[in-house]
Amino acid sequence: MMTYQEIFNEIKNKAYFKNHRHVLIAVSGGVDSMNLLHFLYLFQDKLKIRIGIAHVNHKQRSESDSEEAYLKCWAKKHDIPIYVSNFEGIFSEKAARDWRYAFFKSIMLKNNYSALVTAHHSDDQAETILMRLIRGSRLRHLSGIKSVQPFANGQLIRPFLTFSKKDLPEIFHFEDSSNRELSFLRNRVRNNYLPLLKQENPRFIQGLNQLALENSLLFQAFKELTNHITTTDLTEFNEQSKSIQYFLLQDYLEGFPDLDLKKSQFTQLLQIIQIAKQGYYYLKKDYYIFIDKFSFKITKIVPKTELVKEEKMLEYDSNLCYRDYYFSFMPKSNEDQGQVNIPLFSLSSIKLRSRQSGDYISFGHFSKKIRRLFIDEKFTIAERQNAIVGEQDGEIIFVLVGDKTYLRKACKHDIMLAKLYIDKLEKG
């Protein structure tokens, strides 16, 4: 067992709170969080911080309300702000955790706290690693809990992570009877599995934590060795070995934590990228992968209503801006080689719109579906999405796509009545 002074001596050089002045402490009332509360209260002047307390009453035990009342009384006595939330809904470990962290985040944002501090220690770290092993987690997820990570508008800090539970002083706290319920995996790991494994190896917890540390260093080294590679560049990606591609893609997917692909889905995704066939491929949870001839990216699916681009009607002898172009019936005074001009054989209004299913354009002796035109000419999906179709009298007279313009072939007896001029708008 250590004293608070000894704990302070060990963590002061880690400068956890160097960039923070107001920190929020997650306090359940258990021995770990009560130690954290007392420690930070005693050393807040030396750490140059001011603290607040955040407590969630899960309403699952008869003692919950008395624990909340005690913490409110303690906070009032010590002139510390306290924020309390009552859990609502169907209770589960995940639902409770999501509720807590959503509450902590909201308090930080509303009250200008730049850090959330929790009382996780090395025993919690070992439990987490063993739970992930049991669940069959990927190698990169065996890195365990980080002592500092981004959270809300600041950071989540775990200053006790290098200490074990037995290092913490004895202090008044509340015993949570639900910690003995074996219906929860963490409780089975803590109360059943770890004690048995420690009989085989008394240093089993230290071994799990060392595994987490080495695993974290391994992926840090991989990131440093591959940071010159643009993962989403298909040429660069496919120049790498299969093993490097595997971990590059895993690293890229870390940017989409709620995507949560199963191992079989990850394998399918990797194969899609390796084949590099252009198109959209649905993944899950409203995500899809978008592949063109140069690159790939993962993004949220856009609702169909948002994919319908705004249409505009261009009347003869008028002008308008549509997307990145300026349409008019008057040429520029100076000869602009970048200006597109389209012969018109009718003075009817022209509808400017996106491509629609079934669209085709006549090239004289033959017609071609615009979809097939895009494929044959190898336009990227982004270029296809931004293509502009000009329709007059129910017939497509031009297609503006990428840096090319395709015109309807005029009939033999058509008489040109005017010209439509198109200029690319300069982006400021």
Curated annotation (Swiss-Prot):
Chemical reaction(s) catalysed: cytidine(34) in tRNA(Ile2) + L-lysine + ATP = lysidine(34) in tRNA(Ile2) + AMP + diphosphate + H(+)
Signal peptide: none
Top EC group: ligase
Cross-referenced InterPro entries: Lysidine-tRNA-synth_C, Rossmann-like_a/b/a_fold, TilS/TtcA_N, tRNA_Ile_lys_synt, tRNA_Ile_lys_synt_N
One of the Pfam families matching this protein, by short name: ATP_bind_3
NCBIfam families assigned: lysidine_TilS_C, lysidine_TilS_N
Function, in words: Ligates lysine onto the cytidine present at position 34 of the AUA codon-specific tRNA(Ile) that contains the anticodon CAU, in an ATP-dependent manner. Cytidine is converted to lysidine, thus changing the amino acid specificity of the tRNA from methionine to isoleucine.
Protein name per Swiss-Prot or TrEMBL: tRNA(Ile)-lysidine synthase
